[in-house]
């Protein structure tokens, strides 16, 4: 049986565990009348961004500890050092955390290890058939943020005792750390975000400019709309309901999931991207990523992809006329139940590979692909085993 967690030897603790304590980390408000920019520099931080209704920027940061000793609490708190200052029209906030990148963190210490209890695990049957999903499906998925309760967390885990026997874990022996960090901002502020090993949820629609440089960070947005937006994301994950305008770069991102995009450019590498609906003015440049494109708006115009070593899974536009053209070489095509393997070019020269529909259609999908895989379908895509 594989060990799920690293085994941690129990140390002699000189201070007694505290049942539950709430510690205030940072609480401050700023009048935003003369402010234009908010700069956030975060490391190991979990935070919600919400709309302010009084033209002030509010920081409210607390952490609740359960079953931690006073010494352990002090060790965690001394690493978290939030600070803020106003420079001209710019409010700067910086927080270096203890890699608290989740709303709730559970910690278990054991002398002899922890295992899965197989009888309590339900495995889904593998499937090679992937169905089209609606834009609404992605909106609902992106709005869901429920984490596991302690009961769910412990359901499939068993502690090993000194005799090698498995037993249920007593919840009183589980350390629980709950983070509650909220920043409320007025709508007129531009945002400059630098984040490492963090988790951020924007629970407001953003129309002002936002520039993001994030590493190993999970980001979730509602609506982003500004032509000057610029995102550079490495690792982590990215979710949004609506992206309208701006430039987005994703590198080695575990999952990009967007309900609707339009009027923007995506530059990606080694990333899995799922899009609910393509609107007008979308261009994607990619190297060695995987795409799932489920729907198109009625007037998406020209959708352009320029890819190398990429896997593209695309469901046809519904209810409208369209034209599809693939251009390149050394690319496998799967159209419904028909497959075609376009050979490589000795001179590395591209040519027209496949055409669907009439070129006079106002809605065009143009895919330039080299060394890739392209699949088209109406309702479902069958993946090779």
Identify the function of each model-found stretch.
Residues 2-8, 19-233, 237-251, 255-385:
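Intrinsically disordered, low-complexity terminal regions
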Residues 13-17:
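N-terminal signal peptide c-region/cleavage motif recognized by signal peptidases
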């Amino acid at each position: 049986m594989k060990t799920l967690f690293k085994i941690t030897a129990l140390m002699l603790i000189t201070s007694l565990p505290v049942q539950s304590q709430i510690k205030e980390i940072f609480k401050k408000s700023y009048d935003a009348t003369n402010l234009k920019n908010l700069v956030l520099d975060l490391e190991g931080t979990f935070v919600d961004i919400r709309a302010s209704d009084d033209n002030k920027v509010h920081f409210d940061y607390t952490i609740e500890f359960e079953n931690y000793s006073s010494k352990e609490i002090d060790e965690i708190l001394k690493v978290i050092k939030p600070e803020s200052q106003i420079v001209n029209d710019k409010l700067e906030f910086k927080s270096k955390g203890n890699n608290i990148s989740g709303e709730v963190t559970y910690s278990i210490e054991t002398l002899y290890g922890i295992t899965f209890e197989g009888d309590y695990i339900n495995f889904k049957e593998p499937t090679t058939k992937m169905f089209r999903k609606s834009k609404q499906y992605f909106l609902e998925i992106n709005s869901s943020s429920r984490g596991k309760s302690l009961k769910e967390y412990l359901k499939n885990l068993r502690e090993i005792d000194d005799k090698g026997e498995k037993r249920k874990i007593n919840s009183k022996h589980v350390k629980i750390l709950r983070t509650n960090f909220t920043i409320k901002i007025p709508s007129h502020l531009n945002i400059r975000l630098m984040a490492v090993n963090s988790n951020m949820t924007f629970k407001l629609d953003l129309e002002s400019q936002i520039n993001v440089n994030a590493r190993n960070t999970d980001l979730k947005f509602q609506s982003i709309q500004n032509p000057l937006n610029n995102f550079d994301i490495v690792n982590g994950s990215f979710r949004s309901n609506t992206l309208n305008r701006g430039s987005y770069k994703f590198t080695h991102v575990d999952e990009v999931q967007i309900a609707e995009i339009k009027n923007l450019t995506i530059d990606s590498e080694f990333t899995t991207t799922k899009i609910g609906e393509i609107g007008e003015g979308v261009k994607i440049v990619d190297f060695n990523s995987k795409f799932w494109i489920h729907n198109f708006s009625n007037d998406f115009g020209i959708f352009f992809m320029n890819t190398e070593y990429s896997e593209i899974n695309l469901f046809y536009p519904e209810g409208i006329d369209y034209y599809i053209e693939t251009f390149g070489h050394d690319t496998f095509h799967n159209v419904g139940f028909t497959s075609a393997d376009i050979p490589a070019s000795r001179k590395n020269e591209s040519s027209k590979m496949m055409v669907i529909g009439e070129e006079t259609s106002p809605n065009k999908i143009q895919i330039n692909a080299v060394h890739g895989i392209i699949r088209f379908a109406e309702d479902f895509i069958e993946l090779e085993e």
